């Protein structure tokens, strides 16, 4: 009986260390090293109301906003993941054709591939700088802003995430759209 009680104590201590201790340690490291990411990278409006996260794509459909990559999960964070459809699926081809048509792409002005294809998780908040520049004319016209000013804002918000590992510069769509709203409000 004594060894049974000792084993119960050992199981309880192990669970306490592995469950509570490990979780607390990971939480503490996250708070110290990456406090913004550990809190969800939330973005708040001027009134303090949370309007999104810089790590999760939102579905912008109005012409006055930059559009993110298509989402296989309809921008639902709870259902994050790619499509289970085969690359030869007619559904995927149909969705790509609809996206190309929505952008008004032509043979002379082809749509960057990323803007027609969903990311692996379906919630990628970034598009390439090239993808944003592709949309600049539409956004500028819809907002009544000079295209050069919209392009300058894109360049201002572009960043290189991994230096030589990911040479393409990226733009966070939500942050860029919020910056456009601020420019329009200030103008």
UniProtKB/Swiss-Prot annotation:
Highest taxon in the source lineage: Bacteria
Compartments reported by the entry: Cell inner membrane
InterPro entries per record: KdpC
Recorded GO CC terms: plasma membrane
GO molecular function, one term: ATP binding
Membrane-crossing segments per the record: 10-30
Membrane topology per record: Single-pass membrane protein
Keywords: ATP-binding, Cell inner membrane, Cell membrane, Ion transport, Membrane, Nucleotide-binding, Potassium, Potassium transport, Transmembrane, Transmembrane helix, Transport
Xref: Pfam families: KdpC
Primary localization class, coarse: membrane
Family as reported in the entry's similarity comment: Belongs to the KdpC family.
HAMAP family in alphabetical order: KdpC
Role noted for this protein: Part of the high-affinity ATP-driven potassium transport (or Kdp) system, which catalyzes the hydrolysis of ATP coupled with the electrogenic transport of potassium into the cytoplasm. This subunit acts as a catalytic chaperone that increases the ATP-binding affinity of the ATP-hydrolyzing subunit KdpB by the formation of a transient KdpB/KdpC/ATP ternary complex.
Complexes and interactors: The system is composed of three essential subunits: KdpA, KdpB and KdpC.
Protein's name according to its UniProt entry: Potassium-transporting ATPase KdpC subunit
Native organism taxonomy: Bacteria, Pseudomonadati, Pseudomonadota, Alphaproteobacteria, Hyphomicrobiales
């Amino acid at each position: 009986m004594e060894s049974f009680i000792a084993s119960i104590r050992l199981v309880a201590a192990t669970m306490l260390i592995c469950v509570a201790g490990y979780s607390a340690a990971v939480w503490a490291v996250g708070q110290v090293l990456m406090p913004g990411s550990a809190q969800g990278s939330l973005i708040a409006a001027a009134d303090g109301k949370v309007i999104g996260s810089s790590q999760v794509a939102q579905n912008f459909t109005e012409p006055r906003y930059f559009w993110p990559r298509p989402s296989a999960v309809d921008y639902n964070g709870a259902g994050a993941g790619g499509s289970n459809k085969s690359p030869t699926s007619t559904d995927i081809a149909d969705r790509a054709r609809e996206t190309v048509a929505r952008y008004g792409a032509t043979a002379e002005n082809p749509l960057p591939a990323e803007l027609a294809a969903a990311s692996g998780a379906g919630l990628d908040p970034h598009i390439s700088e090239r993808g944003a520049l592709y949309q600049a004319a539409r956004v500028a016209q819809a907002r009544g802003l000079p295209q050069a000013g919209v392009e300058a804002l894109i360049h201002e918000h572009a960043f290189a995430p991994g230096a030589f590992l990911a040479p393409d510069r990226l733009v966070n769509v939500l942050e860029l759209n919020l910056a456009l709203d601020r420019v329009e409000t200030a103008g």
